[in-house]
Amino acid sequence: MREIVHIQAGQCGNQIGAKFWEVISDEHGIDPTGAYNGDSDLQLERINVYYNEASGGKYVPRACLVDLEPGTMDSVRAGPFGQLFRPDNFVFGQSGAGNNWAKGHYTEGAELVDNVLDVVRKEAESCDCLQGFQMTHSLGGGTGSGMGTLLISKIREEYPDRIMMTFSVVPSPKVSDTVVEPYNATLSVHQLVENTDETFCIDNEALYDICFRTLKLTTPTYGDLNHLVSMTMSGVTTCLRFPGQLNADLRKLAVNMVPFPRLHFFMPGFAPLTSRGSQQYRSLTVPELTQQMFDAKNMMAACDPRHGRYLTVAAMFRGRMSMKEVDEQMLNVQNKNSSYFVEWIPNNVKTAVCDIPPRGVKMAATFVGNSTAIQELFKRISEQFTAMFRRKAFLHWYTGEGMDEMEFTEAESNMNDLVSEYQQYQEATADDEGEFDEHDQDVE
């Protein structure tokens, strides 16, 4: 039954991942010991997508936890759902990657990668029909970015026909841990462009703005940010975990969302945005959900969709609501804002509805957009990258681990190409084709 193997790498990946398992265990009625005590058959119908049923009716996440230092994993193990995971699936080193992509990708991470692949292989073998992998990691550090992308390429090698999906936290200057984030992120994007099928770009800057502006939290903590991420991840994976009318699996999502193989970086959004304490006071209507969901303030990537155009969109609605009303509202959005959707992909908005709402609200909606505006995010990283790289600042940390400057140049130009590709399709119109054909003939 269409299983997904989950991998979380590095500090950020493990913290988001742990939160994700808390949220979905709660939604499926699974307590911290792995026992089921839910109240609806729907919770168990597709439980095996993310959980393995072990002896004694215990449910165990199909998860592999990876880090180059033991700290974060110890806190996951000590956390509320720490006893849920298989103890053998914790794989960690002692050295740490020190926020250095090269350590994660070429030296320290490369030593640990085979142990991780053993765990992944074991999880994959216990699946009936594996549909793919999902990874949570950040692009700014050393382990999640360097070792995370190494794992992705190794898994890609071994399971070339399975879908690879990532939830990637993109660094931002407003919440910065390290000065070399632009290097690590650029080197990672260079890998993600080639090796993943779908990447959800989660942007700390956007999460901060949401907490600060919308939720009125004056000093947002990582806990608050991760709460938003886990709501989004839960929403994105709803179709995979519950039976529904438009039963998305990872492959169907990819087929609907990715018009060109390199342009698979999605902007997630979520509605209603409520802070942890004030969820129960007001119930939203379908029109309000739809309107909020397309609002730039609700996007988890700090890009303004009004600066670009949507190639494709997927929306997941959750809760008891009328399909008819949902369809009407979605059409309404498209008709009113038709200039923000490319006209050369007709029907480029897909909607799914699932009956089970997330905890604490009657209805919710999750938004996944493939928008050309995501180029703003890559431009931002690219500018910071170039500023340091032209002075060769901090490069010795990377060349010291055996990297070549050439690799930086390649990553830089690959990311710039990606930006131009998005720009090209943003400007393309339905009647451009004639021109392209003529060019082809000249070439011959």
UniProtKB/Swiss-Prot annotation:
Which Pfam families does the record match to this protein? Tubulin, Tubulin_C
InterPro entries per the record? Beta-tubulin_BS (IPR013838), Beta_tubulin (IPR002453), Tub_FtsZ_C (IPR008280), Tubulin (IPR000217), Tubulin/FtsZ-like_C (IPR037103), Tubulin/FtsZ_2-layer-sand-dom (IPR018316), Tubulin/FtsZ_GTPase_sf (IPR036525), Tubulin_C (IPR023123)
GO cellular component terms attached to this protein's record? axonemal microtubule; cytoplasm; microtubule
What keywords appear on the UniProt entry? Cytoplasm, Cytoskeleton, GTP-binding, Magnesium, Metal-binding, Microtubule, Nucleotide-binding
Give GO terms: molecular function aspect only: GTP binding; GTPase activity; metal ion binding; structural constituent of cytoskeleton
> Where is this protein chiefly located?
cytoplasm
> Which parts of the sequence are annotated with region: Disordered?
423-444
Q: Which residues form a coiled coil?
A: none
Record carries keyword Metal-binding: yes
Q: State the PROSITE patterns in the record.
A: TUBULIN, TUBULIN_B_AUTOREG
Write out the biased-composition intervals (Acidic residues): 429-444
Instruction: Name its cellular compartments.
Output: Cytoplasm, Cytoskeleton
Tell me which residues bind Mg(2+).
69
Extract the CDD domains matched here. beta_tubulin (cd02187)
* Residues involved in GTP binding: 11, 69, 138, 142-144, 204, 226
BP term (GO), one: microtubule cytoskeleton organization
Give the cofactors, semicolon-separated.
Answer: Mg(2+)
Say which family it is in.
Belongs to the tubulin family.
Oligomer status and interactors: Dimer of alpha and beta chains. A typical microtubule is a hollow water-filled tube with an outer diameter of 25 nm and an inner diameter of 15 nM. Alpha-beta heterodimers associate head-to-tail to form protofilaments running lengthwise along the microtubule wall with the beta-tubulin subunit facing the microtubule plus end conferring a structural polarity. Microtubules usually have 13 protofilaments but different protofilament numbers can be found in some organisms and specialized cells.
Role of this protein: Tubulin is the major constituent of microtubules, a cylinder consisting of laterally associated linear protofilaments composed of alpha- and beta-tubulin heterodimers. Microtubules grow by the addition of GTP-tubulin dimers to the microtubule end, where a stabilizing cap forms. Below the cap, tubulin dimers are in GDP-bound state, owing to GTPase activity of alpha-tubulin.
What name does this protein carry?
Tubulin beta-4 chain
Q: Which organism is it from?
A: Caenorhabditis elegans
Its lineage opens with: Eukaryota, Metazoa, Ecdysozoa, Nematoda, Chromadorea
